[in-house]
Every structure is written in C-alpha cells, then in structure tokens.
Regions:
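N-terminal secretory targeting modules
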Residues: 1-83, 230, 235
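Conserved SGNH/GDSL esterase-like catalytic core that processes O-acyl groups on lipids
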Residues: 74-150, 170-177
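Solvent-exposed, polar/charged alpha-helical surfaces in well-ordered, non-transmembrane soluble domains
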Residues: 85, 93, 97, 101, ...
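Hydrophobic/aromatic beta-strand patches that form the interior of the parallel beta-sheet core
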Residues: 85, 164, 194-196
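Conserved beta-strand segments of alpha/beta enzyme cores
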Residues: 105-107, 162, 192-194
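Structural signal for conserved beta-strand scaffold positions within catalytic alpha/beta enzyme cores
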Residues: 108-110, 165, 197
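Active-site segments of SGNH/GDSL-like serine hydrolases
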Residues: 154-180, 202
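Catalytic His-Asp segment of secreted/periplasmic serine-dependent ester chemistry enzymes
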Residues: 180-235
Length: 235
C-alpha cells in the first residue's frame, strides 16, 4: 500500500488522523536509519542487571515493557539482548520505535511501498554491510503478490538464519489471501521459518488499525509488536 501520496500531500489537505500518521512515519524513518549505525547497536538496551534481588521486585523499566507488550520478565530480558534485523514495508516502518523498545539492538530496514519481489538487492546489501543478523523479521506482502520462486531467492540469500515471517492484513486489496496462502506454504517448506499470524490475531479488531484498515493505530502497534515479541522470544 503506497503512502507516497500521503507523505508528499500538503499539510492543509490532510485529516488530523493522516497528519499524525505522516508525522509518525517521518519520525520512524529517522529512527530506522539510526538503527543501521553500528555505534547504535551497543548502548541502548535496558540495564537488565538492574534487579532488586533482595526484595524480589521487578525493576520498573522491565515491568513497563511486560505490561505494555504482554511479555514475561524473561522475555523482556531476552529481547534486550537479541540480535534482530527487521525488514519490511510501511507497516513495519510504523512500528520501528515500538520494536526498538523491545529489541534495542534491532536493525530496521523498512520502506514505503516495498515489494517482496524486488527485495533481494536490499537483503544482499544488508548482508554485505554485516547488518543481516542471525534472526530476521520479515514484514512484507502489504503491497502485492510474489511468486514462490521469488521467495525462494530471498531465502537463499538469508541462508540458515532464523526467519520470523509476518503475514498480512490488507482487506481492501485482492492479493491479501494469496499472499497469506504463500506465506503459509513457505512456513511449511522451510524449517527455519516461524509464521507470525498477524492476520488471525487482528481479526475483528478495527481499533487496531488506522482509517486505511492496513496500518496499525497506536494501540495496534503495541499489539503488533507484542505478537512479534511473543513469537520471537522464548516463554
């Protein structure tokens, strides 16, 4: 789903909802670029040694993430240390700051309008730069179809890394079910793919989406990120 028209539209033609979304996207584009800086990969995690073992209390910073994203203490601590590359389209781009909360070392490469079928070059570049980590989160499919062969090419480049594949919810577009069927098939085909069923989790939850029914609202971003984290991190 292309947001280019929204991004370049004059401010006075946007609704309050659209203007807020545009600002969110622009902020997350900056954050995503910053995640690619190797100097940013080391110092942003919560201090997981900040425990109060004598009283048995969970530190406030850990407890906040537990509540917000419905995670266990152990999952939050794992997330602070996990190496993860998140590669996707504007749906993932919108979640950049949320992902960074749970996974401070995450590398986010997400752009508006990205298609799976032309993502191979970008994956190769991330790999060349040492930014394709051992865990790869794929958030593609919102903008159109791809073939099994194109998906295979992507997986060949990714190699034996653990892949977390998020399926899609685009009820206004004819390709939604075909994309999700392909992803189901690929999750069965590849042992190193874990399917994250955003389509199922978000069913019947209109408040989780902005007015376009595709991009998550603020609440939806929390639900989206929490679902990812609960699938990526051991319980």
């Amino acid at each position: 789903i292309s947001l280019i028209g929204l991004i370049i539209a004059p401010t006075n033609t946007l609704t309050a909802e659209q203007e807020a979304f545009q600002q969110k996207i622009e902020e997350n584009q900056k954050i995503a670029e910053e995640t690619k800086s190797q100097t940013n990969q080391t110092n942003e995690a919560i201090d997981t040694t900040d425990t109060t073992e004598t009283s048995g209390e969970i530190p406030e910073n850990i407890a906040t993430l537990m509540t917000r994203y419905q995670l266990t203490e152990e999952q939050v601590r794992q997330g602070q240390q996990l190496e993860l590359t998140a590669f996707g389209d504007s749906v993932m781009l919108g979640a950049t700051s949320n992902l960074q909360e749970v996974f401070p070392s995450v590398v986010v490469d997400a752009v508006i309008g990205r298609q799976l079928y032309n993502s191979l070059k970008e994956i190769k570049q991330l790999k060349k730069e040492g930014l394709l980590k051992k865990n790869v989160l794929l958030g593609l499919g919102s903008n159109g179809l791809a073939t099994e062969a194109q998906f295979d090419d992507l997986m060949t480049e990714i190699g034996d890394r653990q892949v977390y594949l998020i399926n899609t919810r685009v009820p206004t577009q004819r390709w939604q079910n075909e994309v999700n069927a392909l992803f189901d098939q690929m999750a069965t085909k590849y042992e190193n793919i874990t399917l994250i069923n955003w389509y199922q989790a978000s069913d019947g939850q209109p408040d989780w989406f902005r007015e376009d029914q595709v991009h998550p609202s603020e609440q939806g971003l929390i639900e989206y990120t929490g679902l990812i984290a609960r699938n990526v991190l051991l319980p």
